[in-house]
């Protein structure tokens, strides 16, 4: 197994991911929302690129759907919820379809469509993701969604943790950047303390979203592995 890493949604190249297993990560907060919603009984998640796309999907059967997402970390006007995983409780999401659009995460998911398998990963389900990757036994590309096309510490250390979980079970051939991600995690296993240095952490912290951050940095509290088969994500 070969493991490589892409540092942002803007850096995805089809030839790099084609026929590979891909894990898309946006721990602050899109993939954490997706994992949480599905774990709490949401039927499926439909990630879209634009607000207008989301509105078109829900317009004819509003009761079936929840609209969730953000632009610049803030709730979108007319949407039911923001991009906080804490919003997506069982009483809200059970038997519903979540239609979501975010600045970084949904773009990364759509960018991965030429992959063989697309798994939705976060710190909260990282070990389960690693186990699924081992089961699939294919070359792996981890896509960090990043922040507005830039590198994100938070996604990078999550990638390192997933790699660490894989390496505890088998050998793998790591690219230089995958080696670096694994090293960064190995030296910073207290995720909460490390992630506070991240640019995106400070954006969310300044908006009063520290509870979101603490939740999203929690390891392995969910054991599902969502998969994207266009146009929807299911567990």
Swiss-Prot record:
Annotated signal sequence range: none
Top-rank lineage group of the source organism: Bacteria
Name of a matching Pfam family: 2-ph_phosp
Record's catalysed reaction(s): (2R)-O-phospho-3-sulfolactate + H2O = (2R)-3-sulfolactate + phosphate
Top enzyme class: hydrolase
Keyword annotations: Hydrolase, Magnesium
Keyword Repressor annotated: no
GO molecular function: 2-phosphosulfolactate phosphatase activity; magnesium ion binding; sulfopyruvate decarboxylase activity
InterPro entries: ComB-like, ComB-like_sf
Entry cofactors: Mg(2+)
EC annotation from Swiss-Prot or TrEMBL: 3.1.3.71
Keyword check for Hydrolase: yes
PANTHER family linked to this entry: 2-PHOSPHOSULFOLACTATE PHOSPHATASE-RELATED
Protein name as annotated: Probable 2-phosphosulfolactate phosphatase
Organism expressing this protein natively: Clostridium novyi (strain NT)
């Amino acid at each position: 197994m070969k493991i490589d890493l892409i540092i942002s949604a803007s850096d995805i190249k089809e030839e790099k991911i084609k026929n590979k297993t891909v894990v898309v990560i946006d721990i602050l907060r899109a993939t954490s929302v997706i994992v949480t919603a599905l774990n709490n009984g949401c039927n499926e998640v439909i990630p879209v690129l634009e607000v207008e796309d989301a509105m078109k999907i829900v317009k004819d059967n509003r009761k079936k759907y929840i609209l969730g997402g953000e632009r610049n970390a803030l709730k979108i006007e007319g949407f039911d919820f923001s991009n906080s995983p804490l919003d997506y409780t069982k009483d809200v999401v059970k038997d519903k379809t979540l239609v979501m659009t975010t600045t970084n995460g949904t773009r990364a998911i759509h960018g991965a469509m030429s992959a063989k398998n697309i798994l939705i990963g976060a710190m909260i389900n990282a070990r389960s993701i690693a186990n699924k990757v081992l089961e699939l036994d294919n070359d792996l590309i981890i896509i960090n969604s990043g922040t507005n096309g830039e590198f994100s510490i938070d996604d990078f250390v999550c990638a390192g943790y997933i790699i660490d979980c894989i390496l505890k079970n088998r050998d793998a051939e790591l690219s230089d950047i995958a080696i670096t991600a694994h090293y960064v995690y190995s030296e910073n296993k207290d995720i909460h303390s490390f992630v506070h240095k991240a640019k995106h952490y400070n954006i969310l912290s300044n908006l009063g979203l520290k509870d979101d951050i603490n939740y999203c940095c929690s390891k392995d509290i969910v054991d599902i592995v969502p998969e994207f088969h266009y146009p929807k994500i299911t567990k």
